[in-house]
Amino acid sequence: MRQIFRLSVAALLTFAVGVQAQVITYPEGLATGMPHNDDYTVRVRVPGREWKDLFEYNVQVDMDKVQDASMVQFDMGSPVEVMVKKNNETVREVAIRPLNNKVAYKQIQNTIFFTLDKPQYLSVEFNGDRLHNLHLFANPLETEKYVQEEKGVIYFGPGVHRPKDLPNNQIRIPSNTTVYLAPGAVVQAKLLVDKAENVRIIGRGILNHPIRGIEITDSKHVLVDGITVVNPDHYTVFGGGSSDITIRNLKSFSCKGWSDGIDM
């Protein structure tokens, strides 16, 4: 009996290590029609395992003179190794911001390697170029996922979603609803939470070029967590007359006036 117990404990420990030592990438991003940026080649892996390719999204920044930057993201549940290769120029200088994170790297020609021991959001810059940088989002693992629409859940799966015949290209979210943007989902609409409560907007998907990203008015108990908003026309999150609003792990890119703001 004692031997069986020890074997069971060992099996449980092995399972726990397997669950924790993981990195989740989003290959669905290759099929969304979102533009790709060839400036970088980025891969990630759990130490000792095979490298996984990431999709390098093209995102636009800077209002005075619009510039093309790059963005990648993945989820991590244990330390990971990252490889970043600069494809179109010789690397003379490297900065990984925020500098306070003190991310150490090793450089081999035009490629750098570094290890992340926890989720964090970084800007990788070569040769002092802050406008054509790589935005690297190492997200925490999702604690809640959906694979289809169900009661109380609006589900956007991998692919491009263009809601038709909706006033102002917006999707109204009712009370007691979870909106889940799956990895690889690209939604081209504004999410409107008006006179509603107990609403959650979660996932790893993208709101792409909406009029506004998320609008929250006269509502309460609203959570926004994990999604990315790319170049809204006006505000990333806009709201008023609301209470108990929580925003976590939100990523936003913009190249228009007022489009990067969170105005509550």
Regions found by a protein language model. Give the residues of each.
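N-terminal signal peptide c-region/cleavage motif recognized by signal peptidases
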Residues: 16-18
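Solenoidal tandem-repeat scaffolds enriched in leucines and small polar residues
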Residues: 244-245, 251-264
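Extracellular "leader-to-stem" segments immediately downstream of a signal peptide or signal-anchor
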Residues: 21-175, 186-188, 195-198
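Extracellular beta-strand-rich solenoid/capping regions of secreted or surface-exposed proteins
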Residues: 114-116, 161-178, 186-202, 208-223, ...
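Sec-dependent signal peptide recognition
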Residues: 2-10
